[in-house]
């Protein structure tokens, strides 16, 4: 690709949503830089970097090395998609301090530090940031104390950055509900009734496809969204609008 091509950095590139994000961004003409804990076959990246976001968020030297490894072109960075996350499930009486640190470092601090470190490149390209929130930022269930708190914080960070950075770059978030990733589908293997029930909880009658999430992200980083910043889009099939009272 030329030095003037659109460039996107996508974290969590090896995951179910991340892989599709990479593929859809490349299809849309972006040069894609992907990063994750470890590489895997079939990731549609032009450049892949193995990186532990816990280390990146805890060690300034590690963060600097990571940014150098990105090899961002002279034209700058068009899109930063903070997609990586950890989900540690524990009830209140068993959550540890380490659970909190691991969750907040990856899900909140890393998106902030990457936005901060890459701000000059994003400004140069007139770029924007999309943070991957979750419906758990708004409505959650038992066992998700750390995860739900971190996603609520990430949505709050999105709004705060949008206000603080003003017209320099745009910052938005999306809150997906259940998504048909390979990991989720494997978890429901042989459990057709439970999978059908999960889809039925959404007014649209199904869960999301990863490509549907990717298309919302692509819209938010496009010029068609030039007047949108500080927003959090619920890509949830209507589940947050529905009461689940017994019939």
PLM region spans:
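Canonical Rossmann dinucleotide-binding motif of NAD(H)/NADP(H)-dependent dehydrogenases/reductases
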Residues: 2-33
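Substrate-binding pocket helix/loop in short-chain dehydrogenase/reductase
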Residues: 91-92, 96-101, 198
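Active-site helix of classical SDR
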Residues: 115, 150, 158
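Alpha-helical segment proximal to the catalytic Tyr-Lys
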Residues: 120, 162-167, 226
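Residue(s) in the substrate-gating loop at a strand-loop-helix junction
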Residues: 134
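Short C-terminal tail/terminal secondary-structure segment
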Residues: 139, 229-247
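C-terminal helical subdomain
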Residues: 173, 193-228, 235-237
